[in-house]
Amino acid sequence: MSTRAGRRVAISAGSLAVLLGALDTYVVVTIMRDIMHDVGIPVNQMQRITWIVTMYLLGYIAAMPLLSRASDRFGRKLLLQVSLAGFAIGSVMTALAGQFGDFHMLIAGRTIQGVASGALLPITLALGADLWAQRNRAGVLGGIGAAQELGSVLGPLYGIFIVWLFSDWRYVFWINIPLTAIAMLMIQVSLSAHDRGDELEKVDVVGGVLLAIALGLVVIGLYNPQPDSKQVLPSYGVPVLVGGIVATVAFAVWERCARTRLIDPAGVHIRPFLSALGASVAAGAALMVTLVNVELFGQGVLGMDQTQAAGLLVWFLIALPIGAVLGGWGATKAGDRTMTFVGLLITAGGYWLISHWPVDLLNYRRSIFGLFSVPTMYADLLVAGLGLGLVIGPLSSATLRVVPTAQHGIASAAVVVARMTGMLIGVAALTAWGLYRFNQILAGLSTAVPPDATLIERAAAVADQAKRAYTMMYSDIFMITAIVCVIGALLGLLISSRKEHASEPKVPE
């Protein structure tokens, strides 16, 4: 195989791997009910199923910086093959967990999948940088990034499609096995085993472990296995969260003092870099809150089945890529800062509208400039999705502009890590607070039931009360999400202008 053909095969295989990892990040949000049924989780303990999302994200975030650096030391080919093998093993465990009804195996499988997926994006980005000259590199790296973003758009729809095709959610994970095998074969025949530099890169193991510990403690501290109306956190929540804060401080101190760091700050413009990452955290939190809670609103409040509720997300997911295209074009005219600010403000407006959804939402429509009307839920989700899409390109572009060229791979990964961190903490925090708020609202509602009411009438009254409590809970969650987006928009004002670029660090002769 020629060098040119070999590198195209290699980068295609890497992009396929990135797409698989991205799909599996989001695929479970539309098949949660089926998974809950097969692993024995009752509907009134829905908070337990969020672990299949949080543990995947935690593994993803913890593995990404460590394994991307490890590929500098041990070679792209070896780390890609190991990561793909791990992804296949995690997929098998997840599918078998459904077969045996084993919740703990399910969580273990998703965690292994997350760790493996966390390595695929940065290593493939680094591989693209290795195989293409700098002048031709932007298009290649953009294609890899597009595979990641495509997964976020298609993931929920992919889950619905596979379940419709095979009538079994386990095939979502079984189908990963042949696809992973194809990617591994393509990498095996297209890459040399000696694909690392002469100088072995050091790996910041301590920094990676501290970051993983900090995020893990925060997630555990926020998770309340027995939510009620009296307290948001479990009895052990506060000391565990304090431990997470201590680990975060230790991580920051280590990264400041260590010789080997996850990201070398030399030449990086810190303020705009951190501001762009902060805005990415806000965007990630909003994205995951939408993917999880819109479907639950459809099922719990509107009485839809799983497929109908997941169909609500189609409007949001259609708007995302449209917004991404418009955001990329708009950033070339108005700049990344303006597009990020405007995009997140539009997103905040969308969530403000969603926070006002009533119990009888299906009866409401919105007038579009007096010309025609569309169902309110579709219009509001389109606004939120369009706004989030607008910031995808500008945030990545703004981050790369203030980082030296040599660190573009790890900087691109940092944007994804920031977004994933927002998703992880957002779903953990709002799930904990939302369930507390639901029980609090439910305890405060009173339903007048006649003393001579039948059992069916009493059950209907209780169901109506729960539906009202759910509506009020989701209203609060989406209002908080709108506030998070406003904070992200303000951070967007601090990102770099088009004239601000990183200074390349001097290399000693």
From Swiss-Prot:
**GO cellular component: a single term:** plasma membrane
Q: Which domain of life is it from?
A: Bacteria
Keyword flag Cell inner membrane: yes
Q: Where in or outside the cell is it found?
A: Cell inner membrane
Molecular-function annotations in GO: transmembrane transporter activity
Transmembrane ranges?
A: 48-68, 78-98, 112-132, 146-166, 171-191, 203-223, 232-252, 272-292, 309-329, 339-359, 381-403, 410-430, 477-497
Main location, first listed in the record: membrane
The answer to keyword rRNA-binding applying to this record is no
Task: Write the record's keywords in alphabetical order, separated by commas.
Answer: Cell inner membrane, Cell membrane, Membrane, Transmembrane, Transmembrane helix, Transport
Bilayer topology annotation: Multi-pass membrane protein
**Primary role:** In association with lipoprotein LprG probably transports triacylglycerides (TAG) across the inner cell membrane into the periplasm; TAG probably regulates lipid metabolism and growth regulation. May be an efflux transporter and involved in maintaining correct cell wall permeability. Probably required with LprG for normal surface localization of lipoarabinomannan (LAM).
Protein family according to the UniProt entry: Belongs to the major facilitator superfamily.
Q: What else is known?
A: Bacterial LAM blocks host cell phagosome-lysosome fusion and is one way in which Mycobacteria evade the host immune system. Triacylglycerides accumulate in lipid droplets in the cytoplasm of M.leprae, and are used as an energy source during starvation.
Protein name as annotated: Probable triacylglyceride transporter ML0556
Q: Give the source species.
A: Mycobacterium leprae (strain TN)
